[in-house]
Regions:
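Substrate-binding cleft and catalytic face of glycoside hydrolase catalytic domains
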Residues: 35-51, 64-152, 293-296
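Short, acidic/polar
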Residues: 14-30, 121-134, 179-188, 269-279
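Aromatic- and glycine-enriched glycan-recognition loops and surfaces
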Residues: 14-31, 54-75, 126
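The substrate-binding groove and active-site-proximal loops of carbohydrate-active enzymes
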Residues: 9-16, 50-63, 110-123, 146-153, ...
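Aromatic- and acid-rich polysaccharide-binding/catalytic face
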Residues: 128-147, 178-218, 235, 243
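Active-site clefts of carbohydrate-active enzymes
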Residues: 199-212, 228-269, 291-307
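Aromatic-lined carbohydrate-recognition surfaces of secreted/lumenal glycan-active proteins
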Residues: 81-86, 90, 142-154, 160-184, ...
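Aromatic-rich peripheral "rim/lid" segments of glycoside hydrolase catalytic domains that contact
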Residues: 253, 267-274, 278-327
Length: 327
């Protein structure tokens, strides 16, 4: 398996990355036997229709913190995929960021015709290019240029221009993180090195399915994955994949809302086992970045009640360690 990875840092805010406490978490993650980490962090725009965004001095991870985290990950023997992500401050899913195709004429203060798409992509391209520069000089082995930006994916010319500009700065492999079931929307995967997707595919109808039952359910999803891999001649990476430790979550692995679901480590462990069995030997598949590993480890006394995506000190951690420790 080329990429035996985990996503790290997503819950971080300014002041969290790069600390000794964070490094302890990285070491525990590396101890599972993986060889990669996706360092994920967020920058926000105010709402889905905003055309400008930037660094938030109150909460955005600083460049120095990100660079220190990269150094810590590498010192633990992990390759790094840098993954800057754009979110909306109002809680709207980033997939809903979009703008009218037929715009009424709007003019700026200088009397020039404005374009929502031009403004947004200009800002987004600058955002990704900034972190491409960090990825280049810190030696990150991969860069992810976007995550689940469904409402923008049809703007092929803008994405191709972004990729062109990024390649002038960063000289490693590039990937884009599509959403599960929506991979066909991305017509420009040919310009990248890998096909990425958030692989939150449902593998049961209700809670309590066995690992064998979940593994069988993967066969349906694998057909579509192989089709898209064959179309572009690129390997697929699960840029995100995971399941909470709660009964019923393998029916909706993306879910983080239903806090009333009862805690169930077996549900999570079976989901992990099924995905690893299903994908491990597929020639069109490059690997996993599981979602997600906490920036700072959760205290043991809280883990016994936790129903989140984290797997530290849960049954799924043992499952993944057994697979990732394979030569």
């Amino acid at each position: 398996m080329e990429i035996k990875g985990f996503t790290y840092g997503w819950d971080s805010r300014k002041g969290m990355l790069g600390t000794e406490k964070a490094n302890e978490s990285i070491k525990a993650m590396a101890a599972m036997g993986g060889n990669w980490a996706a360092l994920a962090f967020a920058v926000t725009q105010e709402k889905f229709s905003s055309t400008r965004f930037g660094f938030d001095y109150r909460r955005t991870d600083t460049d120095r913190e990100i660079e220190t985290a990269i150094k810590q990950l590498k010192e633990s023997g992990l390759k790094v995929c840098l993954k800057p992500i754009l979110n909306c401050e109002d809680g709207t899913w980033r997939a809903n960021i979009t703008f009218p195709e037929r715009e009424f004429p709007v003019y700026d203060e200088h009397g020039r015709l404005k374009s929502y798409w031009n403004e947004w992509f200009s800002c987004y391209t600058a955002f990704i290019c900034h972190y491409a520069e960090i990825a280049e000089y810190t030696g990150c082995e991969m860069l992810c240029i976007g995550c689940e930006m469904i409402g923008t994916e049809h703007k092929e010319e803008f994405w191709r221009e972004l990729i062109r500009q990024v390649r002038e700065i960063y000289h490693g492999p590039l990937v884009y993180n599509a959403n599960h079931g929506k991979e066909e929307n991305v017509k420009w995967f040919d310009a990248l090195d890998y096909i990425g997707t958030s692989a939150y595919y449902p593998v049961e109808k209700e809670g309590g399915a066995s690992a064998d039952e979940m593994t069988a359910a993967w066969e349906y999803h694998k057909k579509g994955l192989k089709k898209i891999a064959d179309k572009f001649g690129k390997k697929i990476i699960f840029m995100e994949i995971g399941c909470r430790s709660a009964r019923g979550c393998a029916a909706m692995p993306w879910d983080f809302v239903h806090r009333e679901f009862p805690r169930d480590e077996d549900e999570q462990a079976n989901f992990y086992e099924s995905a690893l069995r299903a994908m491990w030997d597929e020639p069109y598949f490059a690997g996993f970045f599981w979602w997600d590993w906490e920036t700072n480890l959760m205290p043991d006394e809280k883990i016994k009640d936790d129903i989140g995506f984290g797997i530290h000190s849960k049954k799924a951690e043992k499952v993944l360690t057994e697979w990732y420790s394979k030569k």
